[in-house]
Amino acid sequence: MCGIAGYSLGPESAVEPTVAARALLTGIAERGADAAGYAYRTPAGRVDVHKQRSGATALLERIRVPEGASQLLVHVRDHTKGHPSLAANNHPIRHGAVVGVHNGVIDNDDALFAVYGIDRAEPGMTVDSEIIFALAEISRGRTGAALEQLYGTMATAWLDEGRPELIVARGLGRPLWLGRGKHELVFASTRLALELVESYVGIKLRKSELPEGTVVAVENGKLVAKDSFQVDRSFHDDPLPAVRAPDEARSCRERLATLHVAAA
């Protein structure tokens, strides 16, 4: 059980990128403490990735999102496949030009790597989530069809250095919330994360859950495309509690409040 979050900001948005990133990280901190990380698209179009083997609190003060970086991905990990001792297994995951985050389990990743003859991005990688971003890279323009090949559970998002949009998708069995502001679109595994953005950034978001079997493209804080894909509901996994790291949640909330007061 992991946590994902992120945003797309329009050019007229007054949201401070780092403050929003910290709020989102805090809002998903409870969902895993094996690793934490974030990625953003630079104004030049490159996606920079930062991750470490820790819970959210240790990352909170280190997050720096530069002005002009209007797209963000955030992740906390409660690992299943792919040990966190190998940094490449932790999120955000890069496969070629695609960088993404995922909450869930993909059961047929090895089979799909073999069918398509795709090599792992780095030696020793075993994380199942990588197949999402490998398929995304070879299936540009056919995202829904690519997602239909995945067998498992999924809430995911990615940035592609070859395309301008942020892609957000929800498959089977994992929560994913969208928050729409005047010039912003924010997503997260928890409603709490969106509420923290509202509180610390000072914007109002219209909150709703993304339906299962839905993929959206977001650019400049606006939804620019939406598609549906078939979800294979025959997959079943053992349910896990959503709160995997309660101590991280508490300490992250306390530290976020302290940082906010210090910056005021």
Q: Where are the predicted features?
A:
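Conserved short alpha-helical segments that host acidic/polar catalytic motifs at enzyme active sites
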Residues: M1-A264
